């Protein structure tokens, strides 16, 4: 049997108003010492939670526990403790919901785990979010009430952690495989695109060379035809020039001949006139007028 000394609320303070009681719920009321006997194997003892791991390594008894008693003071304190724990659980749950989208990022995931661990440590509910990387130590509190499946629960938590780690590793591996496949597909597409573009460029270069050859051939043919026409024109010009010169020479010769003929005829007529004039002088007879019918 263990004898404990507790505190009960005095009847004098129970008659205060509801507002004053709610404002001073967390304060220590005036009390008197009451002696209670607690037996080890009864149901009226404190219901303690399994020990959680402290900051110094090793399991420590929880800082808060729910005590069941018949007194008014114990019921008020338990109601306050349950309300605080419920509020802390609600805050922790809202933090978990608000940060559920950022669990894939390492920094955000660590911050969420740290916040949840702090909240659950503050209310004494950090059994499920403890440090799974270290080996828990044995319980040193003989009065702690441990559930029957406590060891199995630790093993299940470790299995859950390992399963989550394995799932994350599988997700990372799947993401890596998908990234490698995507890079391989991108490399194939790039190689195909490069080959097609090179083929099109080579085809265009061949067509350009053919077009340039055809253009050069057409230009050469046009120049050859022009030169041929020029040569023909030169020949025709030479022939025309020669023909023109021949015609000019022939005209000149004919002109000379006609001039000589006219000159001879003139000389003959002048000599005949002079002879008739001399005869008329000698006879002394003037020239007679010619009639219309006279012959010259």
Swiss-Prot record:
Signal peptide per UniProt? none
Residues that span the membrane, as ranges = none
Keyword hit for Cytoplasm: no
A Pfam family cross-referenced in the UniProt record is Remorin_C
Where does this protein have compositionally biased stretches of type Polar residues?
41-53, 62-78
**Which keywords does this Swiss-Prot/TrEMBL entry list?**
Cell membrane, Coiled coil, Membrane, Phosphoprotein, Ubl conjugation
**Official protein name in the record:** Remorin 4.1
Provide the protein's localization: Cell membrane
Q: Name one GO biological process term.
A: response to abscisic acid
User: In the UniProt record, does the keyword DNA-binding occur?
Assistant: no
Question: What is the deletion mutant like?
Answer: Slightly reduced susceptibility to Beet Curly Top Virus (BCTV) and Beet Severe Curly Top Virus (BSCTV). The double mutant rem4.1 rem4.2 displays resistance to BCTV and BSCTV.
Give the induction annotation: Induced by mannitol, NaCl, drought, as well exogenous abscisic acid (ABA) application.
Q: Where is the composition biased (Basic and acidic residues)?
A: 21-39, 121-135, 253-266
Tissue occurrence: Predominantly detected in bud, stem, root, flower, silique, and leaves, and enhanced dramatically in senescence leaf.
**What GO terms are given for molecular function?**
kinase binding
> What's the encoding gene here?
REM4.1
* Coiled coil feature spans: 226-261
